[in-house]
Amino acid sequence: MSDLTEGTHPRVFETISQVVELVADNRVPLATERLVALVAEFPREGLAHAYLAWVLSTSGRHRDAIEHGRVAVQLSPRSERVSLLFFRVLWSADERPQALDEMRRFVALEDSEEYAQIILEMERAGM
């Protein structure tokens, strides 16, 4: 997965790793709290906004999730991870046309094996 993470503070990666574990342990409120603090500390880190969007989405807070996803893409437009997280946030919010627009936006900039796989699965499903 391509990702422009050069210059990303190590604490961002550490916190995201912890947050993924918290979500897996169904401790979403604590994960949200940690990401809100991370975004406050690193407001220009697209990856932090993208993971906050993902966690908010898992809580059904789709409007807030989409807002943070948009910020993430603006801050890190060439990050595949950011784009994929935003795509999933939009998809889970039933914003399918916007999700497909995000996919098209990213694949126009970069090759993406993961998006290629998603497209293949959609074609198999007749979408």
PLM features per residue range, with description:
Residues 9-44, 51:
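Alpha-helical segment of the N-proximal tetratricopeptide repeat
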Residues 16, 47-51, 81-86, 101, ...:
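Alpha-solenoid helical repeat scaffolds
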Residues 37-40, 70-74, 107-108:
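Conserved structural position within tetratricopeptide repeats
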Residues 87-114:
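TPR/TPR-like (Sel1-like) alpha-helical repeat modules
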